[in-house]
């Protein structure tokens, strides 16, 4: 019986996309909430968000099977389906992240970093809500289950993204301190 149509690859893809949304927390704190302490950490946050998003989308593309199915998926839209909306949400998030990274790293357009950050923050909330809604509509037969999964995905995004970012920064610091210790001795 095919009550749940997604398998383990889809779960990993959605997890990576949720982490991509959440790992942007540090950049959001620096630009949206104007916390100067987080400014040096923000570009890494946005780059990691892009990397996790591309990883999750690569898993979804591999699940399509033949390469010609990707062309069909990109050119044929059913706008009544939330899956079609997610194509725009995912590609839009990638584009917004590229612009956001550009505004953070280029001094000539640095003044646009805050508006780009606010737009990226809003877009990622919509993206995570859409992803949570898909799961809600697929697995919930009762109305209360559908409504609670979108906020749950936002919470998971905030938690998983922050933890993954912390672990990556911690690993980088451990690696660089080991390299610095090796050079000193």
Regions found by a protein language model. Name each.
Residues 175-180:
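Conserved small/polar residues in nucleotide/adenosyl-binding loops
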Residues 112-124:
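The cytoplasmic-loop to transmembrane-helix boundary for the fourth helix
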Residues 6-68:
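Membrane helical hairpin/interfacial module
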Residues 15-26, 86-100, 155-168:
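Hydrophobic cores of alpha-helical transmembrane segments in multi-pass inner/ER membrane proteins
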Residues 2-19, 37-45, 76-92, 115-118, ...:
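Membrane-entry segments of alpha-helical transmembrane domains in multi-pass membrane proteins
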Residues 184:
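Cationic, low-complexity basic patches in intrinsically disordered or flexible, solvent-exposed regions
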Residues 1, 57-71, 100-104, 121-148, ...:
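C-terminal ends of transmembrane alpha-helices
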Residues 51-108, 135:
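Membrane-interface helix-loop-helix modules in multi-pass inner-membrane proteins
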